Amino acid sequence: HDVGQALVQHPLTRAVGFTGSQRGGRALFDLAAARAEPIPVYAEMGSLNPVFVLPGALDERAEALADGFVPSLTLGVGQFCTNPGLVFGLDDDKLDRFVSRTSALVEQAAPGTMLTAGICEAYHEGSSGVESLSGVAVAARTGTDVDRGKTQSQAIVFETSGTTFLKEPQLSEEMFGPASVVVRCKSKAQIQKIARNLEGHLTGTIHGTNEDLHEYAALVRILERKVGRLIFNAFPTGVEVCPSMHHGGPYPATTDVHFTSVGTAAIKRFQRPIAYQGFPDDALPTALRNANAGGIWRTVNGNVSRENAS
């Protein structure tokens, strides 16, 4: 903590990148804002990455959805920032099929070793707290005992109702590890109400059919305001480094919704724009001269090109 504080407050520091807890990221953000000359903090913090499994998808492939969900949940012992920590669906026999298959796979999963003893302890405390809540049940947990001395943890899937989820703030807190909560909603209206009440997250996922997308068009519009990456019929743990990737989201997922921490645009967090007006060509930086010596992509008079400018 002292080292982080010193780095943020050092006069030569011009910007800060951070991945960690909401408390840690907010502390650094506040320190940077309190400087005589404030600097930006690009903090990536907690995210539960909600997954919505819609009726058409569950009817067609409930078991296949579980086959994709459990590996995403347990990947890296649940320590990916895109770990799917919430699943929402209508409370019916189709969701029963998904939960049944998910439970069977989780029970067969092997315990995993977490990165540090502190992370492991926080995971056990968080999951135990959720388990103790009224109206929350354990659907499944890894069947093998763990060695806490080796920082091992079990995968756990909880179940609760939409009504309980709405009244229990703790269910909206990240359990950093292989744990997820399946929320059984009583209606489409309740699903939309829950979505409107969500905080900011890195990702949101919808599994559905084309018909589901039309039926739940309002849900898509709601999630557009809640997440940085909206996924259809896939799982959130795959994060490709490419120009189209946006790995960010509304607060408290990050402290600046406009930037990504993954992908080619990530470097823009640490650039400062400057415009040159009226300079002769030979006085400009090489990249801005008429002759494109480096053959780089440039925008000239609104057109993207590698050609020389006239």
Pin down the residues of each PLM region.
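Structural signal for hydrophobic packing residues in well-ordered secondary-structure cores
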Residues: 11, 15, 32-36, 49, ...
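General beta-strand structural signal in soluble alpha/beta enzymes
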Residues: 18-20, 41-44, 138-141, 231-234
